[in-house]
Structure formats: C-alpha cells, structure tokens
Amino acid sequence: MREHLNCLHKKVQEFPTTSGCYKMYSQDNKILYIGKAKNLRSRLKNYFLEKISLKTKILMRNVVNIEVITTNSEYEALLLECNLIKEHKPDYNIKLKDDKGYPMIRITCEKYPKVFKTRKIINDGSEYFGPYVNAKHLDLVLNLINKTFKTRKCKKKSKNPCLYFHMGQCLGVCYRNDLEEQYKEEVNKIRHILNGNISKLLDEIEIKMKEVIKREDFESAIKLKETKRSLIEISQTQIITKINKLSTDYIYIHKTDNLNVIVIFKYKDGKLVEKDINFDESIYEEEELIAEFITQYYTSLNMIVPDKICIFKKIETEDITKLINELKSTNTEIVYEETKDAIKIMEMAISNAEIALKAYNNEKNKALENLKIILEMTKLPKTIEGFDIAHLNGYKTVASLVTFKMGKPFKDGYRVYKINSLNDGEINDFKAIKEIISRRYTKLINEQLELPTLILIDGGKGQLNAAYSILKGLKIEDKVTICALAKQEETIFLPNKTQGIKLPKGNPALKILQNVRDESHRKANSFNRKLRKNIKLNYSKIEGIGEKKAKNILKTLGTYKDIFLLNEDEIAQKMKINIKMAKKIKKFSEDQNLKNTHSIES
C-alpha cells in the first residue's frame, strides 16, 4: 500500500503549479473523485500528508492513478469540475438531490428578445452567456443591464405603456410594434458587453462614481464600485461551457522531434466532459498523422462518434468523413476551426499536451532503467539500433536499420540496404543478418563513429547468434549489448544465455523493444514493397500491358533474372499470352536485368 502511494506521490511532484481539475482513478479505471485547484501540484500534495481525514485516507487507499486537466484560470477549473462531476458522478464527490448547476444569462429568440437569468438550457435558438459562478455578481450586472438598456421586462402585450417605460427602462414594445430596429440596437449593445467589451461602460461607471463621491453619497459609490467589479468578473471569457446541443471532439496534435502527443477534448451538450491523450511515435507528417489518427480512432469498435470533429490543421477530410459515417452509421462532420473559442481550446490542449509529454518522458526513463537491469547492461540504453530482414520468396532481400534515442524514434538514424550476399531466390536470414551487421559496424569503426548502447535483432536465437558472431569478429562484443526479440512469444534472447526472458504483457521495458522491433519490421517491408512496385511499374511500360497485368507478371514470373532464364514459349505458357507479347516481356526483362543495381548503401 505504502509503495503505491509513494509512486503516486512522485508523480504528483511533476504536476504543474497552474489551475485545473484532477481525476482520481481506482484499480478498475473508475473515477473515484474529481476536484479542482488553483495550484494542482500543491493541492494534490496535501493528499499525502499524515494528518488527513479518515474519509480521505480511505479514498487514497483505493486510488491507483491521478490525471490532471489544466485550465486557463481558476474560474474555468471551477466550471470544469462542475461539468465533470455531473457527467461521471464519482462516489467520493457530493451527490446533490437536484442538478441545478450555475446560472446563465439568456437572450430569447423572439422579435423583441427578453434578457434574464436562467439555470435551464432550452434548445429553441436562444443565446446563452455564462455560466457564472458568482450569482451575486450576475445579479448586479443584470440590474445594471436592465437600468442601462431599454429591453422589455413584462411578459404580455398591453394597450398602455408599462411602469418600466415611465422609469425610462423600456422602449415601450409592450404596447408598440414599430420599434424593431431600435430594440435590435439595444440587444446588440448587451451582447457586446456580455462578450467582454465593457471598457465604455466602465468609463461611464467611473464618471458616476466621481459624481456621487462629490455629493458625499458614499453608499451609492460603494454600490457602483461593486457593480464595476462584478462587470469585470463576469466579462472574463471562459471556454469550458459552450451552449449548444452537439457533441463535439476537438483534436490537437502536439508535435516534437520524435514523439506526437494527441489531445482530444470531448464536449457533450456544450460541456467539456472528458480528456483523452494518445502518444504516437510514427514518422507521419502532421497532415498525414491527423488523417490516419482520425480514421483509426473513430472506426474502432467501441468508439462513439460525435456530431462534429474539430481540428486545427487544414486537411482533406471528404473521404475520411465518408468512411467513418459509412462504417459507424453516423452523420458526423470534420471541420477546421479557427474561431476565438477554438483557439482558446487549442491553448488549453497545448498546456495539457506539455504536461502529458513530461510525464511520458519520465515513464520512458523509468522503462529504460528497467531495460538496463533486465539486459544486465552497465549503462542506460540511450541509443538503440534495430534490424530486420524482408524479402519476397527470396527475391529483393533487403535490410532495415532504425534508431531510437531515449526510447523514441530518431528518423535521421534510419537506413535501408539491399542485401548483396544472397542470390535471387535464396532464403537465408542468418547470412543476410551477418552481412548487414558487418556493413553497419565496420563503417562505424572505420569512421570512428559512436556505437549504439543496444542492438536489437528481429528474430530468435539463430538470428541473434548470427549477428553476435560478427560483433565478436569485429572485437566489439564487449562494447555494445545485443539482444533479439522473437515476435511469436515476445521472448527476449541474449548471447550465451540458454533461456529466453519473458516479460509480462504491457511491461514498459518490453514495450520499448517491441516499438523498435515493429518499426524496423515496418521499414524493411516498406522498402521491399517499393522495390517490388518498381518492377511492376516497369513492366507496365511495355506496350499493351497495364497495371493489373504488370502485377500478375511479377506474381507469376518473378524478377527480371527469372524471366531472363525463360524462353518465349515458357513465358507465353505460364502467362497464357501469345508469343508476340512473350517476346516483348523477354526483351524488356533482358534490358532491365543489365541495368539492375544491387546496392543503395555500402
């Protein structure tokens, strides 16, 4: 128990000192408690003090993880806390009998709109401003609006003007029907103020304050001062609650050199109810990454698709939208957002991405420390080089090299090689591995370049021994650690060890090795496909052969060298074509075979 609390306490030390909300999770990933804080780190540290209440002690015994969402102000944290508690109803939060929430200002959707306080949202085209945490401030500002702007207060039409008309607080729309333009101007002024444009009104209040002080009417001066403060308070722009009935996901991608942090803010009925963070180590450009992520994320089996997906980068979305809607039977839209509110949401996403990135890097460092112990290394595996071999039935055999630094992909260290030591059709992974390890580390030694701290081979004991024999031949087996990872059982093999190491699924150290292995596998297969595609494309240059037939030639006959060994009759028979076309294929293959080169990197 104490150990898990110590781990949580260390995690809390890394949290930001800004305002925001925090969520405490149980072992089964259930939210136990949601809180807010002006200073997240300081607030959460209090949970680990000796002198805490019995209820808090019971809570902390069940907490296994804490997540934070940063906000732009304490005010926004308060609103977000309210929204999250209503959405998730955690066991350790207060359960209210009603669900009344914070008050808002409503401007009704009518010819002559009314302006009043409400706690209920009605989807009838009305405009809502807020919510406002301090109801007293809201009342003062509404009182100021009612006295300053001549909007209607009475509910029914009348033949005679109302009391407010005689007090100069109403245009008289209760008995006249020809004041639409004038009334519209009054309402627009109110909108202007509620959107935060209050400088002119503040100046007017300041002048009135000076006047009443001159008359020594200090009671009025105090009221005006309080009204001024209230006006400033409620004019603060907040972005946590947007009044609409759509469910909307905002997706922001925070790119760094070797890692992408993908932040998703999920809004439901205009309220932020969930934050989802994903980490991506792929080498996609930002536009490709957004498209790929949205496709994979929203087409997954249990993912609920919102009414709208907002992104902060312009990309082509027509095909993605169509695919999601067809697969999930939805009617979502993907839109590029650059509104004022969207920009503020993006700013909040950036803040949360940076916090998540810091936590991720800390976890990576712990995973590397763990890997160092497991592999019995003398130093941290800061640089890992991973190798894999790919071929097509022994043809176009290639090797890939990927580099990871501090557990993350380092694209400048990626290489691909054509294997020279194998004949076409020869399948020998051990020989291919020996060649690539020899070429790579002979070059590093000759050029006096730094060796990696760890080499990872995609394969089992045989592939490992082949690579290790080359390291011994180069006399660097004591300068670099080498291991292999067998995909089928995810077993780690080390030289001179008879038994492999099996780590639990999800182990952070194993995850690093899997990432390196999978990336080297992807790179090798990608290069192999490229070479095969080039052959296919070249075949399609023959007159009378299209893409489909070119692909069939590759599948049926193999490489240029294979075709070179066949005569026209054999080609015609295998491909079921006439002799004339077979001669064209034979001639083209002979020409290409002469041009074919076997080396990309020496």
From Swiss-Prot:
Predominant localisation class: cytoplasm
GO molecular function, one term: DNA binding
Record-linked CDD domains: GIY-YIG_UvrC_Cho
Residue stretches making up the GIY-YIG domain: 17-94
Localization per record: Cytoplasm
Record keywords: Cytoplasm, DNA damage, DNA excision, DNA repair, Excision nuclease, SOS response
Matching InterPro entries: GIY-YIG_endonuc (IPR000305), GIY-YIG_endonuc_sf (IPR035901), GIY-YIG_UvrC_Cho (IPR047296), RuvA_2-like (IPR010994), UVR_dom_sf (IPR036876), UvrABC_protein_C (IPR050066), UvrC (IPR004791), UvrC_RNase_H_dom (IPR001162)
GO CC term, one of those recorded: cytoplasm
GO biological process: nucleotide-excision repair; SOS response
Gene3D superfamilies found in the cross-reference section: 5' to 3' exonuclease, C-terminal subdomain (1.10.150.20), GIY-YIG endonuclease (3.40.1440.10), UvrC, RNAse H endonuclease domain (3.30.420.340)
Residue span(s) of domain UVR: 199-234
Function: The UvrABC repair system catalyzes the recognition and processing of DNA lesions. UvrC both incises the 5' and 3' sides of the lesion. The N-terminal half is responsible for the 3' incision and the C-terminal half is responsible for the 5' incision.
Protein family per UniProt: Belongs to the UvrC family.
PANTHER family for the chain: UVRABC SYSTEM PROTEIN C (PTHR30562:SF1), UVRC/OXIDOREDUCTASE (PTHR30562)
Subunit structure as annotated in this protein's UniProt entry: Interacts with UvrB in an incision complex.
Name of the protein in question: UvrABC system protein C
Source organism per UniProt: Borrelia turicatae (strain 91E135)
Gene from which the chain derives: uvrC
